[in-house]
Amino acid sequence: MAAGGNVLGSTFEDLRDTIALIDDKDRVGVCFDTCHAFAGGYDLRTPEAFNTTMDDFERIVGVKYLRALHVNDSKAPFSSHRDLHANIGTGFLGLRAFHNIVNEPRFAGLPLVLETPIEVRDADGQLVKDDKGKAQEDKNIWATEIKLLESMVGMDVESEEFLKLEADLARKGKPERDRLWEQNEKKKEKEAAKGAKKGKGKGKKVEDEEESSELSDVESAGGE
């Protein structure tokens, strides 16, 4: 879903059409990946955006096919079509998106699978390295994130507890968000420049065709 373009499964409509081709649907299921969806242009960040996305999923695909969720934040910006997983609350999705998820009745009883990085970072988001300069890893990060997700069930997003969690995690993810934002902006600039160059070439071709047509008309008139 993150890739978009000509990749099958990049939209809810793709999933719907694929499922429609299967005769025996008893074992058909869809896994909803939060990072993939966000990168593919499906917003989850506010209650309104989240409800719109999930209502669209229910209407187009059918919530009966939803079997599991892969729960990841996104290092890359919204609709960037880049599948780059981030730790919960540190990416462009942000902690409120995951508050929406853990409090969504339609997800009750579904398995939520973490696919987040296990690189150790300090409070400012810098990688913690060992004596040899190698980035440290810690699988206990997953246990911490599971507890974080569980703690947000029923939590008030305007409470002091939530706001502190949100701020701390956003701070931790800022270096990676800034880095990926810059990459995304450069990519858009290159694409815009490429499009402008292509447009100029097309305009020149039209001008040449018009000039050629005018010359033909003159020659034709002279011949008469």
Predicted regions and their residues:
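Short, electropositive alpha-helical surface patch
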Residues: 9-17, 48-55, 82-99, 122-159
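Glycine-centered helix-coil hinge/cap
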Residues: 58, 62, 94, 178-181, ...
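Glycine/serine-rich loop-strand microenvironments at binding/catalytic pocket rims
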Residues: 28-32, 102, 108-110
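Mixed-charge, low-complexity intrinsically disordered regions
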Residues: 124-224
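A short pocket-lining beta-strand/turn micro-motif at the edge of beta-sheets
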Residues: 65-67, 108-112
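Short acidic/histidine-rich active-site segments
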Residues: 111-119
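Acidic/histidine-rich catalytic cores of soluble enzymes
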Residues: 1-90
